[in-house]
Amino acid sequence: MLVNHFISWKINYYLSTKPYQLTGLSFLLFPLTFNAQEAEKDSISATIQTVEIIGRRSQDYVSDYSFAATKIAMKNKDLPLTLNTVTKELINDRQAFRLGDVLKNVAGVSNASFYNQYSIRGISQNEEGQIINGMRTRQYYFLQPMTSHIERVEVFKGPASITMSSVDPGGTINMVTKKPLLNDRYEVSLSGGSFDSYRLITDLTGPLNKSKTLLYRFNGAHQDGKSFRNNVNNNGFLIVPSLSFIPNEKTSLNVEMIYNEMNGNLDRGQPIFGATARKTDLNSTPISLNLGAPGDFFKTKDLTLMGSFAHHFNEHISFNASYMKQFWDEDTHETRTTNSFVPDISNNPVPSLAMMQYLERVQHWEVDNINAYFNFSYKTGTFEHQTLLGYDSHIWEKKNGGKQDAARGFLMKDGTVTASYNPANSALYQTMMYNGITIPKPNVNPFDLTSGALNHQGNDYSVLNIINPLPTALTTTHAVYVQHLLTWKKFRLLAGIRQEWFQDRTNYKKPEESAFRNQKLLYRVGLTYSVSESTNIYGTYLTGYQPQSNTTSLMPGTSGFTGGISASLYKPLISDLKELGVKTKLFAKIDASFSVYEINQKNILINANNPAEPDQLIQRGADRSRGFETELTGYILPQWHIYAGYSYIDAKVVDDSNPALVGLAKENTSKNSVNLWTRYNFSAIPALKYFGIGAGILYQSKKIPWFTRSFELPAYTTLDLALYYAVPKTKLQLALNVNNMTDTSYWVGAQNYLRLFPGAPRNYLFTATYKL
């Protein structure tokens, strides 16, 4: 039977003959049209949990709660901050197999490159790794993670520093994995499409015993794909088993494993030919041009083990704990530019000849996360209280055996290699001729960008002149925090403080070990007022902190930072957020949010853009980002879904050692962006009842690159379309997704003339899914 109703957050949960009422969680399903039995089970599974143990059965674009934002599963409407959620249903409808494809649905979030690297509200991410189920993993960001095991992706805007460690000022991306369901469900899908891309995905779940106290879920995926870019592959497989044990109405446990192997290439972007200031032709080279060699590779193995435990002592007191252990290994061979052109004998750049380097890197990391907290619910008179007392730790060890060797620079006549060219000593350098021009001979063969030029793309270097064992390191963060939610009439006051202690030990367990320590007290306060049942207004203030030592390596070109001999060269990144907003429900069907904000950050770490030292870093004084966001999620009609957003970002440099930069726009930031996805099912039309259609639009206004202000990346609009068909009298569903239908040429980001990141041309993906 189909129903349309509200489900209260106070419900009875039966695991035996005894009903047990949990009153410590705020959870409400918005009025939607779906199966009543599924609705009941959804509310049950959400209500028993204070950490996520049981999965979500409802199948729509709306997820109105979050565990990670406050650790008390507040309704999103009551949160005094902006939280955007992309559910697995939207992920599946768009066939968004990579995280970057998921995040283009979120207002104010944009790709800065091909990597797992994003700008949120005009502020680029600094931290390496991913956050999974509220805990931080560590891995290089060059390949985007698969999403087949993801229940939803949450984006917390601003520094979510009270409940998470060392978060980025612009926002935090949290990936929530799929958990076991109470009923059997089996799903297998096979996809194939452009660029010789093939994917196989399986999702199996259900109970393992009659009493349904032991549940399982298994997600697996295999990807074999090329790219529109030359010499680029992205292959891998993913195995994610999960078990949930619920022996009684008070206790629950989940254990989970994620094993991910990826074998691809580091794609450093498209170089352009003959580029000069204000005379830059972005189409001077094909968007497929990649300077990497066919023999290059980027191989990683990532094993993550997780456990979550929750126990309710009574209806007022509960305890929650989570643990994560991660092992990560990397083996990389890479041919790339030095972000510069080869000079001639007079030291003038030759803008058709890219200076190259070759790197070999091996690394082994281990990560431990612990998160534990007590939750107390009580009343004093007319006031309702929910107090959280917690501790967490994050330990990241870089193991022995790591290295980053390189070949770059110029060859000298005595057989040595020097990092840079000095025209005053030109007689000491080996030379060669290029199109009638005398140039100092590079250690690694340069790449000729001239159309039709013959380039032998291989590991062509004379001397592996940089032998760099990566030092062992141990980075630890310990924190205690207190959070209090006070509810009185129509007001909710959410306040919290966090004391964090940080230590970075370089050359860990070696005689030359050195240590750097830092600490910070962080706080936040947010007030929500319920204007009506459907409308809340809020204001919030948050502070953030990142210790910029060996932990930071995500900024462009900072690959050598993880091998730095000092942990204390740079001041910590300090940030804060001020935000006002409105959250409401329009026409009882569409969740809408509107917010204005200001984010300030100080001591920003950026690349020095020094070709002789490509990994050199400097610090900028301060940036400021102000903006406005609005988002709509829900149903226009019962069969018509919508997910849309608009973002305006005014991000500027407010303090820099170069006075000419003060007041200028921040790099890689679009002022205006629009995202829209909508799906319509023809269920009300008998002749078309098995069909559905989808359409999406993404608009980004112009932006400037990271390392040069001499050219702009133009604004662009892309159109995506989808067609869905449920084969009658079978469990088979078919989907055809066409991305960039108009075959628009565009660039998502850039660093300089030699590293632009073009968007994919028109491409398609056909998917067949069988469900039981």
Where in this protein do the model-derived segments appear?
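Outer-membrane beta-barrel translocator/receptor signature
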Residues: 149-151, 162-239, 247-251, 303
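Gram-negative outer-membrane beta-barrel transporters
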Residues: 598-600, 619-706, 769-771
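Membrane-embedded beta-barrel scaffold of Gram-negative outer-membrane proteins
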Residues: 312, 318-324, 328-334, 571-635, ...
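Acidic/polar loop-and-plug regions of large Gram-negative outer-membrane beta-barrel proteins
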Residues: 223, 227, 240, 244-312, ...
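Structural signature of Gram-negative outer-membrane beta-barrels, strongest in the C-terminal barrel
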Residues: 246-248, 365, 384-396, 401-403, ...
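Short acidic/polar hinge/loop motifs at secondary-structure boundaries
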Residues: 107, 135-159, 175-178
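Extracytoplasmic beta-strand/coil segments of soluble accessory domains associated
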Residues: 61-63, 67-75, 80-83, 100-136, ...
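Conserved C-terminal beta-signal and adjacent last beta-strands/turns
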Residues: 359, 363, 375, 386-387, ...
